[in-house]
């Protein structure tokens, strides 16, 4: 559902698989200045901060991980584009948490592009919306909010009517490709 590409300065001496990336990142965040050692022939990473904190995080069997493609990812088409500011992203994620809403829709109607957090299976669902741009197109691109766990920042968002979206972080060399839900619609 989600593929991330990042260009980093650190050297990683070997390939390894992480089954639960959010859990791994949260483990790393337990240290304010972590030192992560994956250089040994062990089946785990040593995550430490001086002598005060230490964690052993086991790698996953690579056969249970869906590997990214060897070729560079690209959208089949760029049908809708908008900028998603850091504050807007924070409000969307916070409203989803506060209201207990599982869905995010990027909706084009009445000349505007808006992000709507709701429960699409419930006709009487509360919702929260943020306008992020203008459009002359009509569409509803749907995501599960659980797939929108992005590193904080401003994103240039491009969405293809072929049910794939690209979120490019303008602060880092970081791109997410996120699959849309199959009930998304685009009238152009």
Residue ranges of each PLM-predicted region?
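DNA polymerase processivity clamps
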Residues: 1-58, 77-188
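Long, charge-dense
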Residues: 62-79
